């Protein structure tokens, strides 16, 4: 981002950043804003079921899959506790999405609801009262049903307290002010992904005419930055990718089955990300929607560690594999087997020194690995081996980036071209396309919307009580 942001901006791209390393330089990302509205069988907004309920379940599944720390894991091995917690969180999310306006549909509200779970002297909590009132108005709501299931499952007070405590621990990071400020609202505009790049595109105009929410053009670049030394907040990146894949599928349908603008997703240091549910299936499916996904790994063991039972399926979904060097024996053995063998002609000669000396020359046909493990491990820097499905392997030099026609637009510290250094924090403060500004509160930066002034004509009656002062 720092190096190529200037070039992207110059070409008219909108740059959005989810920065989990330096949160003051991040756009805002609220996952609840991407829970889709529900429509009935004839295509109209469904008042009785206003949201797509499976989106809520998908979001909670992603959160739970990526927040498995020692302090909240179930050590008994009994799935009951995790299932009960999941039902409890589902009820809270459904309540938030049903009863709060957009400005308050966030994790802060969910945590506030959890704080209402403490029962009074009668054994009834304020949260119970909220759901009882909802149940009278909408007894068939899935949120009401899930809360009733939770109350039945956690009938004992101690059991209920344990489930609530575990749920609180799982969402504890949203109590951190930096994270709350970053996730309370949303400026990511993920719905733009894959849309036509021209605002005047007939297809984009048609889509917006049929949509309740206007969608911007697809000329946008997203950067997801994680902290290399700490994976505490990486679950947000996993949620981001999970929702991004779902939105790509929806946008492809809006565009007639395939995205109007090709999307390239580069997942460098992929092993640092949390678990993305159904990643193998998404990898196989999305490539048919005008989407390319590049996964960067240090070794094969990183892939096996993350997807123990399906790592081979991940590789099967990749049409090309680029090896740029490494020392991992497991990785090298896999690549040697992938390269296969080649037929070699072996020439051998012999000669005897005796009274009746003789000599002989023999040609043999033998099989040999195209490259041995030792040869691959000693491959010179700057070289690579490229595997392409259905074609074979190529041994080549890496492309020299300096030969690219746009290289001069990149920031390069050695070239002393600091004017091409992209600073997203400045864009958040002063960018021409931004309608929000960065403020500082005790050293903490956060993003808030700017209210645009209303301009209108006035008459004499409006000026009766107006007092003018001057110096």
Regions found by a protein language model. Give the residues of each.
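P-loop NTPase motor domains
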Residues: 1-291, 306, 374-395, 410-471
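Conserved nucleotide-binding/hydrolysis micro-motifs of P-loop NTPases
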Residues: 22-25, 228-230, 299-302, 327-331, ...
């Amino acid at each position: 981002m720092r190096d190529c942001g200037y070039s992207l901006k110059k070409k008219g791209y909108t740059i959005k950043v989810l920065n989990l390393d330096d949160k003051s330089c991040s756009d805002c990302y609220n996952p609840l804003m991407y829970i889709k509205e529900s429509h009935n069988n004839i295509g109209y907004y469904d008042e009785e079921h206003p949201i797509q309920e499976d989106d809520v379940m998908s979001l909670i599944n992603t959160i739970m899959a990526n927040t498995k720390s020692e302090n909240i894991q179930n050590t008994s091995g009994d799935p009951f506790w995790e299932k009960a917690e999941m039902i409890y969180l589902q009820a809270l999310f459904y309540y938030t999405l049903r009863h709060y306006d957009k400005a308050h549909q966030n994790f802060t509200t969910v945590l506030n609801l959890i704080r209402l779970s403490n029962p009074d002297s009668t054994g009834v909590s304020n949260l119970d009262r909220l759901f009882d009132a909802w149940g009278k108005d909408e007894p068939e709501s899935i949120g009401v049903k899930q809360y009733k299931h939770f109350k039945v499952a956690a009938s004992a007070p101690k059991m209920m307290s344990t489930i609530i405590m575990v749920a609180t621990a799982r969402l504890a990071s949203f109590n951190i002010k930096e994270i709350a400020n970053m996730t309370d609202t949303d400026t990511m505009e993920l719905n733009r992904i894959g849309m036509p790049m021209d605002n005047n595109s007939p297809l984009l105009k048609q889509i917006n005419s049929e949509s309740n929410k206007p969608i911007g053009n697809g000329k946008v670049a997203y950067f997801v930055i994680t902290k290399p030394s700490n994976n505490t907040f990486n679950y947000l990146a996993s949620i981001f990718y999970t929702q991004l894949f779902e939105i790509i599928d929806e946008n492809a349908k809006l565009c007639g089955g395939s995205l109007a603008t090709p999307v390239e997703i580069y997942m460098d240091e992929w092993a640092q990300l949390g678990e993305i549910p159904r990643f193998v299936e998404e990898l196989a499916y999305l490539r048919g929607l005008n989407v390319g996904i590049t996964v960067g790994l240090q070794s094969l063991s990183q892939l096996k560690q993350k997807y123990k039972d399906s790592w081979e399926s991940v590789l099967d979904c990749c049409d090309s594999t680029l090896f740029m060097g490494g020392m991992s024996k497991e990785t090298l053995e896999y690549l040697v087997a992938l390269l296969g063998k080649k037929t070699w002609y072996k020439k051998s000669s012999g000669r005897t020194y005796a009274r009746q000396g003789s000599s002989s020359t023999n040609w043999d046909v033998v099989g040999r690995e195209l490259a041995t493990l030792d040869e691959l491990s000693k491959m010179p820097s700057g070289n690579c081996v490229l595997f392409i499905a259905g074609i074979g392997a190529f041994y080549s030099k890496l492309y020299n980036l300096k030969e690219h026609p746009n290289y001069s637009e990149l920031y390069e510290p050695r070239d002393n071209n600091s004017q091409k250094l992209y600073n997203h924090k400045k864009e958040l403060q002063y960018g021409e396309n931004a309608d929000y500004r960065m403020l500082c509160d005790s050293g903490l930066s956060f993003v808030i919307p700017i209210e645009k002034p209303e301009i209108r004509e006035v008459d004499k009656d409006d000026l009766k009580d107006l007092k003018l002062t001057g110096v």
